[in-house]
């Protein structure tokens, strides 16, 4: 009797590891949440078909407010799988769930899977040069968060790249595009006027990471904001100081303007 946090990877049902698949198949009950990320290349039916068992999909409210009522009682009596997109422990929500499981006396295990934190290397930007990441959230009435702007500023001062996750409103089937994120960041720039994110800022967009044909594009905001990057999920990267190999990679594989080679 235990709770297994199992990652599904980034794109489709085939991204789950062999260990994760075997574990899910032996579990007596399977729950899943998809409000922290999106698997664009698959469906719930295909995941169920691969595992061979029905999956109970949980909402944000189910997970964050009723985990002790819905999932933990089951895990005290049988083996239970909790499926998540990406790697289970990347989302802070899931770390909290594991703490709650331990406090309830439920043994838990983590089975890793491909994560955006590793997949972002397909852009050619060196992983060790990434600083703190942040999420660009949709502004709402009387609420316009800007902390991600400050994260970009802090990272750039140290020459580091910034990985920006884009807001998800799964219950509304609303997934922020890189274009929307750039528009929001330009609005914040208009408010703060610190020259951190302008039409001349170099950005990198990675769409559908984990697929065989992800979209990787690099260029200046003034040009990129009008591009079509295809289906979500998207992530936006604001590069810091580029190494010559990083710049060459962006030119060759992401269509970056060759003039960036003159700046390294």
Swiss-Prot record:
Pathway(s) the chain acts in = Protein modification; peptidyl-diphthamide biosynthesis
Q: Which reaction does it catalyse?
A: 2-[(3S)-amino-3-carboxypropyl]-L-histidyl-[translation elongation factor 2] + 3 S-adenosyl-L-methionine = diphthine-[translation elongation factor 2] + 3 S-adenosyl-L-homocysteine + 3 H(+)
The entry marks the following residues as binding S-adenosyl-L-methionine, namely: 10, 87, 90, 115-116, 166, 209, 234
State the source organism's domain of life. Answer: Archaea
Q: What is its EC number?
A: 2.1.1.98
UniProt GO MF annotations: diphthine synthase activity
Gene3D superfamilies (UniProt xref): Cobalt-precorrin-4 Transmethylase, Domain 1, Methyltransferase, Cobalt-precorrin-4 Transmethylase, Domain 2
- Signal peptide interval: none
Cite the InterPro entries for this sequence.
4pyrrol_Mease (IPR000878), 4pyrrol_Methylase_sf (IPR035996), 4pyrrole_Mease_sub1 (IPR014777), 4pyrrole_Mease_sub2 (IPR014776), Dphthn_synthase (IPR004551)
Any idea which UniProt keywords this protein has? Methyltransferase, S-adenosyl-L-methionine, Transferase
What biological process terms from GO does the record include? methylation; protein histidyl modification to diphthamide
Q: Name one Pfam family in it.
A: TP_methylase
Q: What does this protein do?
A: S-adenosyl-L-methionine-dependent methyltransferase that catalyzes the trimethylation of the amino group of the modified target histidine residue in translation elongation factor 2 (EF-2), to form an intermediate called diphthine. The three successive methylation reactions represent the second step of diphthamide biosynthesis.
Family of the protein in this entry = Belongs to the diphthine synthase family.
NCBIfam families, per database record: dph5
Which PANTHER family is this protein grouped with?
DIPHTHINE METHYL ESTER SYNTHASE, DIPHTHINE SYNTHASE
- Quaternary structure per UniProt? Homodimer.
Protein name, UniProt field: Diphthine synthase
């Amino acid at each position: 009797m235990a709770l297994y946090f199992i990652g599904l990877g980034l794109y489709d049902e085939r991204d789950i590891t062999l260990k994760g698949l075997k574990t899910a198949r032996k579990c007596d009950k399977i729950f899943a949440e998809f409000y922290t990320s999106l698997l664009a290349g698959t469906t719930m039916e295909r995941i169920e078909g691969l595992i061979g068992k029905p999956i109970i999909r949980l909402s944000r409210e189910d997970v964050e407010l009723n985990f002790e009522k819905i999932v933990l009682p089951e895990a005290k009596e049988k083996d239970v799988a909790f499926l998540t997109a990406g790697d289970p422990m990347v989302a802070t929500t899931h770390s909290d769930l594991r703490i709650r499981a331990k406090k309830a006396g439920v043994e838990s295990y983590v089975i890793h899977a491909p994560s955006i934190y590793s997949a972002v290397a397909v852009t050619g930007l060196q992983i060790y040069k990434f600083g703190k990441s942040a999420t660009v959230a949709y502004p709402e009435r009387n609420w316009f968060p800007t902390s991600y702007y400050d994260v970009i500023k802090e990272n750039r001062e140290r020459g580091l790249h910034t990985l920006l996750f884009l807001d998800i409103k799964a219950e509304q089937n609303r997934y922020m595009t890189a274009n929307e994120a750039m528009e929001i960041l330009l609005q914040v720039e208009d408010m703060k006027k610190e020259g951190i994110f302008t039409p001349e800022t170099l950005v990198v967009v990675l769409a559908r990471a984990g697929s065989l044909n992800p979209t990787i594009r690099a260029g200046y905001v003034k040009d990129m904001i009008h591009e079509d990057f295809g289906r979500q999920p998207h992530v936006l990267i604001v590069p810091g100081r580029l190494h010559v190999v990083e710049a060459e990679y962006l030119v060759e594989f992401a269509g970056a303007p060759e003039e960036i080679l003159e700046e390294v």
